Amino acid sequence: EMTEKWEQMPKDIEWHMIGHVQTNKVKFMAEYVSLIHGVDSFKLLEEINKQAKKHNRIIDCLLQIHIAEEETKFGLNEEELEDILKNFDSAQSDNNSFKNIKIVGLMGMATFTENTAQIEKEFKHLKAIFDKHSQLETSNLKLQTLSMGMSGDYQLAISCGSTMVRIGSSIFGNRNYQ
């Protein structure tokens, strides 16, 4: 869907891929995407780097952390995050194999619930993870963006430290999935 829109729109637009990204779909967006919000595996990072290299680009990425109680949501747990950051850091220093991606932050989605105390707890947990790792820095790793909060909970997310919110439904209305 994004590729169809990209072909019709001005080429100076910065495109963000929001949502779960399948590894086999990266090749379709690597030519133009500026930021991929939902990177949830080391394998996906490798594929983004591979496809970005083909286009001589650097693609910014947010690592998605699983903070919700819902199992249907994607994301890394804290151990997987730490493994990626260690592997990424060592890959950077050893052979700079990830020169076509830059990890610029973390993102997470809270549980879909009316319980604001639970949502706040999940947002604060992600903020603590972000703060714990925000001092890490290499040529392609610097956590500057904390993306949490959507149209229904963005104000709470901002109060918990979010630096980027996803509020497309508030601006454009609900999506029509056909």
Predicted regions and their residues:
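Conserved alpha/beta-domain cores
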Residues: E1-G152, C160, F172
